[in-house]
């Protein structure tokens, strides 16, 4: 394995999922993260797979059969080795095509509301990469071209022709991202609003608004920004600067929502993500819930669990079970204790 703190680990859980109980810094979150990498080849906690390698190791490997389908992902400095039912997959796209879907919930989700735009872009990107292979490819091309353009701008020399060539890629792939994000947000709006009412138990109105940083015409925005980008030595327009506006009862949620409302909005956003994945793909995502239940009151915990599809697989981490009796739906899930890098049933 050699994944973060684990040199090796084997765990067998029921199809319904597992509750992982243990103190902080014992590896509970890492288990959820490894499952996310196995399913989606990406971590919600890091953009780079290299950062997941256990200290002193050359790479990591994760394997499992979450849907009666043996999957293996092995990372090393020279690339990824991917297999499904022992058959090699030549690239990430072919590995992900018949794979599963993931919704990750954690306390860091509060940053979706009160944090910088990067957090909300990651929310949209994690959704988009699962919904649409074209989105995943466009985002990969966009990031590579953006990195190259920024390097040329930082160089400071006149290299206009090279910069323009990368801008053509940025316009083509960026337009795909913008159109997709606008469509995703439009589909999320009613789902998030419904989830907000269910979890809060109140008639609260949650509204999502897509804000493309470049306006509707990306090519024209880049043209208008050329002098500014030359002066600042970085690209200042494009989907990498987009944002997702969140309003509660007509007011900016990050400025006016209470702590309880912030937690409810974060849950509503992730529940909406899960429902949209289910509607589009026709299958239930795995819900990975990292230490969120201890921070919720019984009403919100039960509303959350009742809103999740009964057939979905749920993995939950927690440091204590004081809240468990008040949440019968969680009490029915198998429990495991995690301590010192070991998992005990």
For each of these PLM feature ranges, what is it?
Residues 111, 118, 122-164, 168:
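Long, charged N-terminal accessory/stalk domains
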Residues 1-23, 37, 49, 161-172, ...:
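Conserved NTPase motor "head" modules and their coupling/switch loops across ABC/AAA+ ATPases, GTPases
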Residues 36-119, 123-135, 186-194, 219-228:
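Nucleotide-state sensing region of NTPase/ATPase domains
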Residues 290-292:
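Walker B catalytic acidic pair
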Residues 287-288, 316:
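Hydrophobic positions in the central parallel beta-sheet of the AAA+
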Residues 64, 313-320:
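Structural recognition of the conserved hydrophobic beta-strand(s) that form the central parallel beta-sheet
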Residues 28:
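Conserved lysine of the Walker
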